[in-house]
Amino acid sequence: MSETIFHKIIRREIPATIEFESETLIVIRDINPQAPFHCLIIPKKTIRSIHEVTPDDAGLLLEMVQAAKALAIAHGFDQDGYRLVMNCEEWGGQTVFQLHMHMLAGAKLSGGFA
C-alpha cells in the first residue's frame, strides 16, 4: 500500500491539530470541515479501507468508536448527538486510502439516513 498524508501526520512530518493520541490511534481535526466539529479518527496500523479489516482488527475498531464517544463527552456533543462515517474505496467517497472514521458534530446535521 502506498503512503498517505495520514502516515506523514502520524510521523509528525506535516502539521495537524491533534485532538487525541494513543499507541494505536491518532485523532486530528479535518482541514476541510463539513460540520462545526469535524475530526478524523485514524488507526496507526496501515489498513487501506474498512473492506480490508480482519477479525484481528475488531479491537481497533472498538477503540475508534470509544475514542469518538470520549470526544463527544469532552466536547459536550454526547447529549445532542454526532455522526460517525467511514467511506470505503473510491465509489464510496474515500479519498485518502488509509482507514479512518469521520466524526461530525456541533450542529444539527442534514442528509441523515434513517
Features from the language model and the residues they span:
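HIT superfamily nucleotide-processing domains
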Residues: M1-A114
